[in-house]
Amino acid sequence: MASLNVNIAKDTKISETVIKNIHALVLMNRPDDKGVYRKIPVTIMGAYTEPVQPYMIKPKITELLIKNEKRKKKMHAIERIARFHLEFEGIHPFIDGNGRCGRLLLNFELIQNGYPAINVKFTDRKNTTKPSMSSIKITLHSR
């Protein structure tokens, strides 16, 4: 994926438009799919949960955005950003590019909150992401 330099305004909130615009950049070579929520059910190999049905994507994204704003007052930024990322990936709103879009959204929030962007190399993802996501899910569900 091409690198992307963006000046992130402090007051820019993640919105459905921002999510779809970031996704459009991720899938710029697939005009029919870029920035468009999926219209078919999907399953993710090795996932513990199934993504929401297509008709629930928009309401779930709206709910996630509202929760994210409320959490800004209650949670440490890192915990809030991690939860947002986990829940976004669980919704799996697009037919392709969810992981890339989710990582860009995660970095958008990190930078906006004064943290450096992160990059998990593709070769490291298999070894770090699955165990980390499993422990995060266990932690979130035990609260």
Per-segment meaning from a language model:
Residues 1-96, 100-143:
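FIC/Doc superfamily catalytic core
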